[in-house]
Amino acid sequence: MDDVVLRGASRDYGEGAGVFDVDLVVAPGTILGIVGPSGAGKTTAIRLITGALDPTSGEVRVLGHDPRRFPRATRERIGYMPQLFTLCPDLTADENVDFVASLFGLLAPRRRRRVREVLQLVHLWDERDRRAGRLSGGMQRRLELASALVHEPSLLLLDEPTAGIDPLLRRTIWEELHRLKLEGRTLLLTTQYVTEAEGCDVVALITGGRLVALGAPEELRRKAAGGDVVEVETDAPFDPAALEGHGGIRSARSTGLRSFRVIADDAGTVVPVLDDLVTGAGGSLVAAREVRLTFDEVFTVLVEQARADQAAIEGEADGATDAGARDAA
């Protein structure tokens, strides 16, 4: 059974705000990252999965249940880290995590061990006696994460778990997330750091409230580029257009007087034969290497494509409306 299933799930706030017609299936033991521009609907999607929001239409199932009606045993299998600080500001860091652990029924010996483990993980053990309200914003984020992890849930829903956290600690947290995955746990997280998508098994890109891309990081990279990308340098000006259609080359475009970029079905097949292809077209190859788009580039291309597609759809709809009005007149 899949841990999380959304079928045509929507939450419509009106005036184009919300999430719309989201189809998503998350298998056990998967890290799924939800990325997108600010205001794209990432947090709304997470809150639908937690049951904090009701879908306007469609269906949401989590661990086999409607999240609005979780049995207690199912709820105890879930850890949730909200985007905003929700713990008690008047309790210490230690007391907050201990209290959350007690809510999930952890008995004293195990509870004390787990509280120490998670506070050490997020580098807050030395701050355990400080009131939560006196911690910095970044420390409060880490305290929320510790509280979400303390009862060792099988499903973790993390809204911006590394926001406001320094790069070294982000790496430590990601190491822990991957360790949890290896134990068979399922993790859904949103992130403002697009490069963190590389650490996910599956990436869901949301923009304008719509799921516009879903797949492994490499799949999204190929989708954005149109295939594998190879950068080529020649010893003299060369028109690469003659290479298109040969040896699995989809397109070849100049990037300078003596350089061009190839989009290929398979870079591993194309690179070894490029010398012959360029020579046969009257050129001389200096170097050829496969390059990988950064995830910032992937994100930008896919978002721009989605916005262009949506604008085209809206333009067609407006045109049909105008035509109908003229016919009626």
Spans of model-derived segments:
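ABC transporter nucleotide-binding domain
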Residues: 175-189, 193-265
